[in-house]
Amino acid sequence: MLIFTFIGINLMSVAQETQLSTIASNGWANNSVNTVIFRKNSLISFNDSQYAAYYDQEQNVVLAKRKIGSTSWTLVTTPYKGDATDAHKSISIMVDGDGFLHIAWGQHNNNLNYAKSVSAGSLTLGNKETMLSAKENKVSYPEFYKLANDDLLFFYRDGGSGNGNLMINRYSLKTKKWTRRQDGMIDGEGQRNAYWQVAVDQVGTIHLSWVWRESPDVASNHDLCYAKSTDGGLTWLKSTDEKYSLPITAANAEYALKIPQKSELINQTSMFADAKGKVFIAGYWRDARETIPQYHLVFKTDNHWEVSKLNFRKTAFSLSGGGTKQIPISRPQIIVWPNGKHYAVGLLFRDAERGNKVSIALNDQLGSANWKVKDLTQNSIGDWEPSYDTELWKSKGILSLFLQHVTQVDGEGKANQPPTVVQALDWKPKNK
């Protein structure tokens, strides 16, 4: 086996193409804010360029850019800061079809922080802007997605944990303006709220899945629901193409899987949808009568939902309480690609059992038990969670991961750690 050594993190080659590049050496590392899984996105590509964003040790928002395939990055420290001491307040970026960079940062039940670049391809940001002004004072979990026509979607939560609503805005390349697509399309009826994950496939269908949470206590997470939209978020359908009557509630939601409360079910994981609209949802929970939480994949076959359990974990743990938790495993990212008549799948994660390295579980025939786990790094990455360049994977089949060694203290705590190296790891499966 070939072993490559780079500054910061050692890389083990498990594919035909692997490359590690150092973006910067001054990444904020006192919590996991730079590496939480709900950064959509931490890295993003457009044409031949890739962009990155992170908080430095002074809590400045820093932007970076390189040519795809290069290991040399250009950096710009923006005039904006975020409260990096709250790990919810991550940075999300996306590039629209005209090449303008859009960014949102520093959000946890507060006023919208949003800006875009002054010109196409630029790392210089303009002034902070509103999108629509209304319902932009209690923003959490900002996420950007790109539609097939290169317009953008912006998802966020309006309100707090337990009573927040999903909001969806759309940015038009033609008008250069944001409009509201949905306001509270998932209704917790004052009793619960949805923690969602989204995937947009190559034809532009929006796929949305979520768990319900009954209170700020993560132990109250339960069930896995699904909806999709083929018209940019205006109307929503079940996987059977039955039209939803909005809002979606606990009573009329499609349940991909029923999972009880107190099952160590994690919220805000990941999903993937291929060009044919096939949906794959990754998460972890503890099955009934078992003590150890395991990673699971939930996916739709011709007419029903199936579950594949990755049964390799040996260590029990419990999810309970509020704030950002220090958990021995990361939330998983999922990538899927065709492999002959089957689907191959990669589940990206970090597990204390494996020394907190960057790991990937590979299966060249989804539905089989043929899982092989490999480590992509030789050293610990701390409390990192995986986030990747969704557009580069769609366009070129290259997995580009944001890497940084970070420390997360339980219950929204702050460590006392010097800054660490921020890197991008590019990896391509052998059979893609």
Tell me the role of every PLM-derived stretch.
Residues 16-432:
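Extracellular, repeat-based ectodomains that mediate carbohydrate processing or recognition
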Residues 1-17:
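Bacterial Sec-dependent N-terminal signal peptides
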